[in-house]
Structures are given as structure tokens and as C-alpha cells.
């Protein structure tokens, strides 16, 4: 059965489900209340075609409520609901992130996407004669589905238990033994010209020295290598729990990041950016550097870039035209660099260094809210 392309509003989520249409003018309201020019849609497409293709294409805008990448895992309330919808159809979901609502409209014109999602309150509108579409709406327009997606995302971001064990941050301080893997750190740190204790500090931050650690996003092993990263590095996925293989893979990734930030000549500063990119992704860090540079800051000085890493969590900044990769949960990345630098200093037996940036005023310690429920450092 053929349908017109209608607006589907799922709780607080606007879906433009492009199920089919014949030369029809569509009136599109942007998330900001403005009306786009009418879009002439002339594609014929139905659910059977989507299922036959095996792929549902979602266009959206970057943001915490729509879609973003977090340590290699796709998140966002609207994304999670669209993923559920794709699962119900038995197809995979592909995401096309657009710059703005005008680009979303262009995707409609070109027939490049099957649905568009953004946050916009309103009502459901559907032609009652289109019984299949109406039934789809009845099945999916439940407030509980939106709430369930939000709860799923919250659970993923605040997960307390993963398959890991807690190891001491230092086995024998008197003898200078940090972990059971010091030999591997000493061997592979030479490839990246790091102090081996810095790599050990990073490893503790990643996995607490547990070779079997697994994050909610699927990162594995001592240095938390993602399966996709392993593929890129030519490392067999089934070897990621092997300590030496995992540390060697991390060294390869660190070396790639060093090359990616070779424009930062000062080694200490370059290492800060490498650590930040290992955690948050080099593209996001480059976005923060671009913002810092535009505002007259030194883009090669981490203390001047770190505030912009945090700003990438706010719409004013992640929607800025200079930003290419959108929303980022930057607080974890800034904290990541600080903690590794501090632990590295403790491994060296010196006072924790001041790298020039602290995201907040000192406050009473509370329970950690990162992907591992670690004991206090």
C-alpha cells in the first residue's frame, strides 16, 4: 500500500516519514518555529521498499537530544527511538547528520532520506484514510517510548558495572612497580617516545589495569580499544584481551594521533592533545581548536583549548558554522587529561603538574560518574 509523506510526531520528536508521495507540496516548520519554503517531493516509496533495501536512512541535526557519537557509540534520544523503529522493520539504520534545517529540507527534495528527526513539540497529523500509517502512529506515538529511550541513554552514560576488576594504581611503590604490564609499557612507549609511566597512567584511567575490561560502548582490554579501531589498526578483534596486543594497538593509535597533531611543535602540549583525542576523538578536538583560534586564543596550548572542548556541549558552539563535527560531551575528556597527567606525576614521585586549566572550583568529592565505578584516586 502506498502512503503520502506525512509528519509523524513521536512525543517530543518530529519525524518526517517519507513513506511515499506523488508530486505533493510539503510545509516544513523548523525546530526554531520558522517555516521553510515548500518542498516539492515526487518520490514514490513505501515500507516494503525500505525493508527490501535493508536500510532506513535517518537525517537529523547534531545535539544531545538528537544524535551524537560517544566513544564510538551512537546516542541521542531521537536516534535511539529511530533505531528501535528500524529494528521493528528488520533493517539497519543509517544516520545522515545535516548542518541545519535547510539541509534537512534539501534531503527531502532529493529523496535521499527516509525520515527526518528533530526535537519539536506538537501534535500527530495523519490522513485517517491511510490505515497502515495510522496504525504505525498508534503503535509508536507513546510517551513511554520516548521516556524509555531517555532512560536507556541515561543508563548507558552512567553505567556503574562493567566486566572488570579493580586493581591498585600501583603494585609496589617502594620498588617502582606500577603494574604487571610494566614491561609492555616500557617496550611500546619507545615507539611513541613517551615515558612508559605516562602510558601506564593512561592505562589505569582506561581500565584500572584489567585486561578483561569492557565498556558499554564495546571498548575492550587494558587500553580500551574499540573493535572498529582494531580493524583500522589491523589488530584481530579476538586478540584485544591479550595484554601485549592491546598495548601495542594503543601505541599504534597514539602514534597516528601524534602525526595528526604534528603541527603542535611543543611535545608536552602535543601529548595533551593526543590524550584528549584518544578519549574524545581528534575531530572534536580540532573543532575546539578552531573555536579557540577564532577567539584569539592559542590553539596549540591545551589550557586555552580545554574551555572550548567544554563549550562543545552547548548549542551556541556546536551549531557554530566553524564546527564540523557537532556536539561533544567534553567534560569527560578534560577530566581525562587532568587525571592522567596527575597520575603520571605521582608515578614519577613528583607533585601533580598544573597544566593551566581547571573546569570548576574545588568542591567536596563525590562518587565518580564515568564509565567505570572506580574507587577514589
Predicted regions and their residues:
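C-terminal motif of bacterial Sec signal peptides marking the signal peptidase cleavage site
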Residues: 18-20
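Extended ligand-binding regions for polar small-molecule ligands
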Residues: 22-41, 76-88, 124-161, 175-179, ...
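Extracytoplasmic small-molecule ligand-binding "clamshell" domains
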Residues: 27, 31-119
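Export/targeting segments at the very N-terminus of extracytoplasmic proteins
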Residues: 36-38, 160-209, 247, 262-264
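Hydrophobic residues within well-ordered alpha-helices
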Residues: 85, 108-109, 137, 202, ...
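Catalytic and substrate-binding regions of cell-wall glycan-acting enzymes that process beta-1,4-linked
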Residues: 124-125, 132-136, 272-346
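Substrate-binding/active-site groove segments that recognize
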Residues: 212-238, 246-256, 340
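Low-complexity, Gly/Ser/Thr/Pro-rich intrinsically disordered linker/tail segments
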Residues: 332-377
Amino acid at each position: 500500500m502506498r502512503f503520502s509523506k506525512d509528519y509523524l510526531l513521536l512525543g517530543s520528536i518530529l519525524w518526517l516519514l517519507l513513506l511515499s508521495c506523488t508530486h505533493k507540496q510539503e510545509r516544513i516548520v523548523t525546530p526554531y518555529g520558522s517555516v521553510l519554503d515548500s518542498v516539492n517531493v515526487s518520490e514514490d516509496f513505501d515500507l516494503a521498499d525500505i525493508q527490501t533495501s535493508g536500510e532506513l536512512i535517518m537525517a537529523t541535526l547534531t545535539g544531545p537530544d538528537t544524535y551524537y557519537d560517544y566513544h564510538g557509540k551512537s546516542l541521542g534520544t531521537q536516534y535511539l527511538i529511530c533505531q528501535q523503529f528500524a529494528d521493528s522493520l528488520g533493517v539497519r539504520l543509517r544516520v545522515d547528520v545535516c548542518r541545519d534545517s535547510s539541509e534537512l529540507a534539501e534531503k527531502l527534495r532529493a529523496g535521499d532520506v527516509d525520515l527526518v528527526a528533530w526535537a519539536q513539540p506538537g501534535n500527530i497529523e495523519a490522513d485517517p484514510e491511510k490505515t497502515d500509517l495510522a496504525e504505525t502512529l498508534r503503535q509508536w506515538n507513546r510517551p513511554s517510548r520516548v521516556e524509555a529511550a531517555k532512560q536507556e541513554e541515561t543508563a548507558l552514560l552512567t553505567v556503574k558495572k562493567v566486566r572488570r576488576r579493580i586493581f591498585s594504581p600501583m603494585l609496589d611503590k617502594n620498588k617502582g612497580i606500577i603494574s604487571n604490564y610494566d614491561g609492555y609499557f616500557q617496550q611500546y612507549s619507545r615507539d611513541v617516545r613517551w615515558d612508559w609511566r605516562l602510558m601506564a597512567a593512561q592505562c589505569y584511567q582506561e581500565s584500572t589495569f584489567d585486561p578483561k575490561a569492557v565498556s558499554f560502548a564495546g571498548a575492550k582490554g587494558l587500553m580500551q580499544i574499540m573493535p572498529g579501531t582494531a580493524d583500522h589498526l589491523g589488530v584481530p578483534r579476538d586478540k584485544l584481551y591479550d595484554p601485549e596486543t592491546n598495548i601495542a594497538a594503543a601505541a599504534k593509535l597514539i602514534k597516528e594521533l601524534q602525526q595528526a597533531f604534528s603541527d603542535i611543535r611543543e611535545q608536552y602540549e602535543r601529548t595533551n592533545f593526543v590524550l584528549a583525542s584518544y578519549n574524545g576523538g581528534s575531530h572534536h578536538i580540532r573543532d575546539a581548536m578552531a573555536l579557540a583560534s577564532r577567539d584569539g586564543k592559542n590553539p596549540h596550548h591545551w589550557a586555552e583549548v580545554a574551555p572550548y572542548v567544554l563549550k562543545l556541549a552547548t548549542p551556541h558552539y556546536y551549531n557554530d558554522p566553524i564546527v564540523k563535527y557537532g556536539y561533544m560531551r567534553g567534560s569527560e575528556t578534560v577530566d581525562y587529561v587532568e587525571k592522567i597527567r596527575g597520575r603520571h606525576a605521582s608515578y614519577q614521585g613528583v607533585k601533580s603538574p598544573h597544566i593551566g586549566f581547571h573546569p570548576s572550583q574545588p568542591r567536596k568529592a563525590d562518587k565518580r560518574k564515568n564509565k567505570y565505578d572506580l574507587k577514589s584516586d
